[in-house]
């Protein structure tokens, strides 16, 4: 099987709900997405514009809860960022914590002060 020019392949369960989609994202890059029994997206794995891989996890309602690109980013049930763990521009490890509204509350870097 060969699908060209913005093609994708979807699979469906016995209830006619989409379960998996394999193909291209809006930027023409590869992506695989999974869905639950309510047709809500549960995960997405693929490439982004700079060629980096990206993994996104969604809750049962299709809301983003975890994003892994160059850092691990978490979100609450309202879609607000709650934490970020990764590497800062200087190459040091960094951790950000946010309140339930997405406001930054705490930051720490691995470099000794």
Region roles according to the model:
Residues 9-12, 18-22, 30-35, 42-45, ...:
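Fold-core signature of tandem repeat domains
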Residues 97-113:
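Short, low-complexity, Pro/Ser/Thr/Gly-rich segments in the mature regions of secreted, periplasmic
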Residues 1-3:
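Short, small-residue-biased leader/transition segments that mark boundaries at the very start
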